[in-house]
């Protein structure tokens, strides 16, 4: 389908891994390389109003080819890959006509197994694009990028009626900064879709409310032989804090609409320790209760410490559940579902156990649910995408554009 696979393989060859804890946006130079490449390709394709902001947001417009009061709609993907696993020297493997069983990932013992990933049983006969076991693949979200670019080429090269189509490619989505510098007014769409989901048919308009919790613990270190009544072990305090967090409310023990506390990192010495938690919950009241719980735990563990020793806790909200904003505009979901059915796909409405740029954009005035890409197992060496799933995503994007074009005629 019009260079879809070629585009995808080109995009994943560029290392665009984002980096947390960096002030600049984009956080890495590699993202600029892909953004500049996309800008050049959009220009060659003949799109208009192409802009690349100093914060790395690339926008462009495909003009309408029909007249009428047709709403401008948008499609958005992010160019960065997760900091959780290496995105350098990605070496994709193409497995045609998958026949079942384990897939060897490169040379070594790493495999992609249907025992661990049962979804493979549903993908027999399809073309799978996997890693070589040493890096992530980057389908999150370069599959989405390739699908949007291919859909633009299809719309540009065929007499398919459509209104004005806006596209945007953002940086640093994986570290939560991409949408913060997105100019909704400049973008000019009435609504949009992020193309950043998973398996074929996924349509997501609910996501976690999310917050980060950073805990700093200052203890007091002395020689262990003379420590009685003097030493305050920051690591022991950290262990006590985590022991108070409900163990059955962690990512590895929850699913569906269940929220969790996630200890993402912990480091330290006797003298000083740091902990970083992520709090997620779909329900806003439960979300606020989880934040209060963390404050109560810190207060309890820190009670009675020497004045020079303390526990400092900082909570920062990351994003909120976009459901409340998207459901105000039901036609956005109706069009996406109809487009999928027209492409012989059964829509699967499911919550995002995470977040997307669309969550932040929805609260900035741009309602923005999430479409599938055909990818699986993001952020690690077992990541893969199906070519057929990517082709389906292109078809759905094109059909959404066509259905929206008919609304104003």
UniProtKB/Swiss-Prot annotation:
Species assigned in the record: Salmonella typhi
Cofactor: Zn(2+)
GO CC list: cytosol
Main EC class the enzyme belongs to: hydrolase
Keyword Lipid biosynthesis listed: no
Residues annotated as catalytic: 80, 173 (proton acceptor)
GO molecular function: metallopeptidase activity; tripeptide aminopeptidase activity; zinc ion binding
Protein name: Peptidase T
